[in-house]
């Protein structure tokens, strides 16, 4: 019922995968040859690479179209000659099969020119070399803005062209099918015609261990859907201890169980253990013929970040944000910048971005910038409550201000790196507004405190000393000055006019 977290490595399934990928490679190569497209592309047709080309590219396409039309005319001419020779009764050697074989020879000769690796005999590895990352096999639909809309690279094919493309790959597959079993022949015939076999790879297995794994997998998903977390945890703990089970296929449901199970360790510890055990630094030896290749989006590679590593970074950031939520108990405590969880996460990411694949992943750089954003928010929040605590004064205050400015600078720098890497959308305007609010906490709140201190000093003195400090009050707050002028008596107004006249004479 559900996907089984094992990889069957017996000879029958290895032969099935070889036949499937070999046929796909033949079809792709023949299609690229007929459609006059380069075989060096590493992605499927997407709206990005189907935009309007320049004039040079259009001229190149016109020249390629001209050569294609000439080749079609030559084929029609040869076909017409064969027809009239057969009508006359002349025996000729250029039969259809021989012409097809000549096309195959020219196609094989063209492989050396296009740079196809002939030494690599693994058809599955040939196929996945074109798709280093899973997202390259998806189409990108730009429908948010009318300016970013691009035409989809649609290609129509007639039934005649399809049969022409399919003829030579099927003929090439006759020799590999001679050494296959009858079951694998039926499997190949079904997938080549676009059919899907009803029997899965695990439904035919009669091994006791595999049958137990299939049963436990079904029970695990059923109990998770019913929110029976205690029983699901027992099944998960039993399943990951069976030899042959790939934990990399079960980590998602395992984290969900650990997060919802009471009186147990958090799923964050499990993700941290996954990052330590399944490191992306492990080297893949090309000379070894691996019978089963695990997809890179499960294990991670030097060009692709593992999904559980990204999930671990996001979960750690959310955990740090929850532990630093503003409350009366947290604000009154002194802030420790060396031993908190957020600083540990920043140090960990700073080590990760020095090595591939993290240094080329835009999402990792965005998480790195988000950590410094949270750090700047936490440090700048101390200035809001400075009037209550009176802790930040003198040199200590200047140090805290420099720390906030440093983290704000890191946020802008890492966001720029994230945008340069591409492939990740960033709310730049929202983040910039938050950074400006952090800066306003440093200076805007200090100015308000200074104004309040001046107002308190003026309230504490008597009216006889108003004219002595009148100029200082005027320079600080003009509105406060106007209200006091309205309350002064006529005698005080006369003294005030004498005060201004003395200032003008001194100037």
Swiss-Prot record:
Gene Ontology BP annotations: nucleolar large rRNA transcription by RNA polymerase I
Bias regions of kind Acidic residues — which residues? 97-108
Note the Pfam families from the entry. Answer: Rrn11
Q: Where in the cell is it found?
A: Nucleus, Nucleolus
Write out the entry's keywords from A to Z: Nucleus, Transcription, Transcription regulation
Cited InterPro entries = RNA_pol_I-specific_init_factor, TIF_Rrn11, TIF_Rrn11_budding_yeast
Main subcellular localisation: nucleus
**Ranges of compositional bias, category Basic and acidic residues:** 109-124
Gene Ontology cellular component annotations, sorted alphabetically: nucleolus; nucleus; RNA polymerase I core factor complex
Task: Specify residue ranges for compositional bias: Polar residues.
Answer: 37-47
**So which domain of life are we looking at?**
Eukaryota
Q: Does the keyword Glycosyltransferase apply?
A: no
* One function term, GO molecular function aspect: RNA polymerase I core promoter sequence-specific DNA binding
Biological role stated in the UniProt entry: Acts as a component of the core factor (CF) complex which is essential for the initiation of rDNA transcription by RNA polymerase I. After binding of UAF (upstream activation factor) to an upstream element of the promoter, CF is recruited in a SPT15/TBP-dependent manner to form a preinitiation complex.
Q: How does it assemble?
A: Component of the core factor (CF) complex, which consists of RRN6, RRN7 and RRN11. The CF heterotrimer may further dimerize to form a hexamer. RRN11 interacts with RRN6, RRN7 and SPT15.
Miscellaneous comment text of the record: Present with 476 molecules/cell in log phase SD medium.
Q: What is this protein called?
A: RNA polymerase I-specific transcription initiation factor RRN11
| Gene name, Swiss-Prot/TrEMBL | RRN11
């Amino acid at each position: 019922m559900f996907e089984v977290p094992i990889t069957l490595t017996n000879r029958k399934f290895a032969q099935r995968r070889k036949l499937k990928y070999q046929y796909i490679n033949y079809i792709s190569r023949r299609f690229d040859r007929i459609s006059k497209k380069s075989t060096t592309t590493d992605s499927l047709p997407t709206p990005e690479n189907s935009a309007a080309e320049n004039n040079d590219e259009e001229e190149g396409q016109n020249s390629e179209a001209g050569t294609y039309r000439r080749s079609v005319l030559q084929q029609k001419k040869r076909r017409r000659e064969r027809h009239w020779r057969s009508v006359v009764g002349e025996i000729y050697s250029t039969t259809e099969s021989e012409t097809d074989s000549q096309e195959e020879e020219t196609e094989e000769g063209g492989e050396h020119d296009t740079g196809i690796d002939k030494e690599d005999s693994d058809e599955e590895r040939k196929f996945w070399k074109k798709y280093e990352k899973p997202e390259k096999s998806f189409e990108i639909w730009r429908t948010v803005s009318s300016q970013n809309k691009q035409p989809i690279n649609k290609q129509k094919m007639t039934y005649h062209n399809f049969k022409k493309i399919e003829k030579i790959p099927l003929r090439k597959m006759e020799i590999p099918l001679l050494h296959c079993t009858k079951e694998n022949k039926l499997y190949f015939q079904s997938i080549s015609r676009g059919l899907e076999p009803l029997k899965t790879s695990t439904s035919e297995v009669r091994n006791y261990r595999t049958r137990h794994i299939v049963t436990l997998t079904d029970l695990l998903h059923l109990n998770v859907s019913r929110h029976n977390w205690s029983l699901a945890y027992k099944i998960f703990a039993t399943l990951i201890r069976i030899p042959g089970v790939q934990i990399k296929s079960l980590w998602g449901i395992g984290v969900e169980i650990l997060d919802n199970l009471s009186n147990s360790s958090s799923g964050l510890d499990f993700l941290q253990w996954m990052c330590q055990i399944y490191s992306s630094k492990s080297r893949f030896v090309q000379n070894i013929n691996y019978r089963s290749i695990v997809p890179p989006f499960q294990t991670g590679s030097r060009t692709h970040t593992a999904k559980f590593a990204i999930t671990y970074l996001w979960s750690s950031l959310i955990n740090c944000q929850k532990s630093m939520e503003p409350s009366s108990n947290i604000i009154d405590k002194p802030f420790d910048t060396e031993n908190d969880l957020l600083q540990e996460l920043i140090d960990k990411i700073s080590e990760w971005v020095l090595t591939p694949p993290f240094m080329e992943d835009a999402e990792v750089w965005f998480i790195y910038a988000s950590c410094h954003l949270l750090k700047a928010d936490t440090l700048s929040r101390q200035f809001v409550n400075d009037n209550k605590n009176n802790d930040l004064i003198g040199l200590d205050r200047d140090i805290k201000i420099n720390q906030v400015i440093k983290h704000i600078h890191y946020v802008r720098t890492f966001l720029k790196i994230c945008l340069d890497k591409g492939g990740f959308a960033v709310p730049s305007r929202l983040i910039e507004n938050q950074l400006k609010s952090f800066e306003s906490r440093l200076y805007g709140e200090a100015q308000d405190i200074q104004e309040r201190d001046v107002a308190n000093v003026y309230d504490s003195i008597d009216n006889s000393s108003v004219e002595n400090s009148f100029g200082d009050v005027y320079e600080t707050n003009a509105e406060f000055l106007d209200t006091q002028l309205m309350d002064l008596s006529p005698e005080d107004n006369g003294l005030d006019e004498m005060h201004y006249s003395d200032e003008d004479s001194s100037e």
